[in-house]
Amino acid sequence: MSATAEQNARNPKGKGGFARTVSQRKRKRLFLIGGALAVLAVAVGLMLTAFNQDIRFFRTPADLTEQDMTSGARFRLGGLVEEGSVSRTGSELRFTVTDTIKTVKVVFEGIPPDLFREGQGVVAEGRFGSDGLFRADNVLAKHDENYVPKDLADSLKKKGVWEGK
């Protein structure tokens, strides 16, 4: 029996070995491409999860959830320093951050920025303590008398309390 007759006997539809290997190569290539895309999707998902805190510059008091207050995770709290809320005891500074809807009491150990004052924009970095107070380890104040963080200005505009430009 010749080689061609032997191939036809094993493959009754008349497809030769060459067609089978091309099909196998295509299938293998598809699996490789699919696998690479899956690995890429997982990598992008992990990167987005890792940078989740940095994607959003800060949260306003109204944006906070119960999980934010109990998880112990670090984040940035932004808003306005409420009028009449600033008090200092030794190196401890206490103040309230508001977005005119909700307020959050903040405790900061250290020297506040020179531009820190009541009624001005502020971003505090830290986490909630077991006592329910936001424990800031860094406080950022506005840069000049016209500066309010864009996210805060947008939030205040939506709520109808924005008086700036």
Curated annotation (Swiss-Prot):
Spans within the Cytoplasmic topological domain: 1-29
GO cellular component, one term: plasma membrane
Membrane-crossing segments per the record: 30-50
Principal localisation: membrane
Membrane topology: Single-pass type II membrane protein
GO molecular function terms listed in the Swiss-Prot or TrEMBL record: heme binding; metal ion binding
UniProt binding sites for heme: 143, 147
Top-rank taxon, per record: Bacteria
One record GO biological process: cytochrome complex assembly
Membrane topology, Periplasmic segments: 51-165
Subcellular localization: Cell inner membrane
Keywords: Cell inner membrane, Cell membrane, Cytochrome c-type biogenesis, Heme, Iron, Membrane, Metal-binding, Signal-anchor, Transmembrane, Transmembrane helix
Family, per entry: Belongs to the CcmE/CycJ family.
Function summary: Heme chaperone required for the biogenesis of c-type cytochromes. Transiently binds heme delivered by CcmC and transfers the heme to apo-cytochromes in a process facilitated by CcmF and CcmH.
Protein name according to UniProt: Cytochrome c-type biogenesis protein CcmE
Species annotation: Brucella abortus (strain 2308)
Gene (UniProt): ccmE
